[in-house]
Amino acid sequence: MKVATLQLDSKMRHVERNIATANAILTSTPPPADLDLLVLPELAFTGYNYPSPESITPYLEPTTAGPSTQWAVSIAKRYGCHVIVGYPELSTDIDDTPQPSNNGITPDTIYKCYNSTVTVSPTGEILANYRKAFLYYTDESWAAEGDTGFFCDSLGSLGKVSLGICMDINPYQFEAPWDKYEFANHALAGGAKLVVMSMAWLTSLPKEEMELEPGEPALETVSYWLQRFSPLMEASLTGGEDVVVVFSNRVGSELNEVRELMTKSGQVIPLGESVSYAGSSCAVRFNGGRASILDMMGKGEEGLLVLDTKDVSLFSVALEDNLSAKLTCP
């Protein structure tokens, strides 16, 4: 299977500009004619750090009917591949417990919003609309938890696919036991052979350090992702088919307008300071008790990464390796 991830430096509140950037990347680096899947990050065209429902309202998109979906349908048909893209969904589900708006007035009806991804077939058919189940602090300022739990189902010629969005791979609300591995175990139980993660994953590295070597991946971040999929690595010891996980993250920085944030490493990002994204989009194949990195992008570069899931890996780590240690390329 040939897979591509489009790593973007999404600009807050500049949907048309971000779409134009994505189009320019695809024009300058045309995907192969036999591409099966193109994956974009979480909230790919809107930016991520919205501090309130009011701030994101102008950029909400009707369920599978807004600019992100329209773009995905167009690109899917143009390149003859599946497309997955993250977007802020305005549903027709009524929120029974709305919060007062900033002016102190609660509207008569408020519809639930979700942090979602839409999956489109090569013919432009909507195959899935997944709503993020585990919300990060930033999401909680405007989105509801997904109402159907994690997703694992057949998606056309892609086969059995598990879909996730960023925080989904973490312990629920950072409070569940570390080794519960809710998302990974759901994918495993569902028999997924492909796991697709759209992400807006933060880094604890300062902005200046992120800009020094933008072409180098944030290996500590990738190491953490692998840890969160330990059940797949362990299960692969007993044989069976390979499982491939695709991580499509974003790059760049945004102003933290939401609240004091804490990264997975425990670093606190104060309100009003910049938050940076870790990039490092990659694909990992789990087989024989090993996690094989097929290819990866840098922590600060925009572009298109194309790979074949049967490719020889850049390097791999085994189940018995200390995954908490920083990964190093050979």
Model-derived features: where do they sit?
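Extreme N-terminal starter segment of soluble prokaryotic enzymes
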Residues: M1-T5
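N-terminal phosphate-binding loop and adjacent alpha-helix
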Residues: L6-I25
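Residue-level signal for short segments within beta-strands and strand-turn junctions
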Residues: Q7, S121, R285-N287
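Cys-nucleophile CN-hydrolase/nitrilase-fold catalytic domain and related Cys-dependent amidase chemistry
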Residues: V15, A24-P122, N129, T138, ...
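Short amphipathic alpha-helices and their capping/turn segments at secondary-structure boundaries
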Residues: I19-L35, F150-C152, E182-G190
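CN hydrolase (nitrilase-like) catalytic-core segments centered on the catalytic cysteine
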Residues: G66-I84, N170-E302
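Active-site catalytic loop in hydrolytic enzyme cores
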Residues: S74, S91-L194, S198-M199, S204-V222, ...
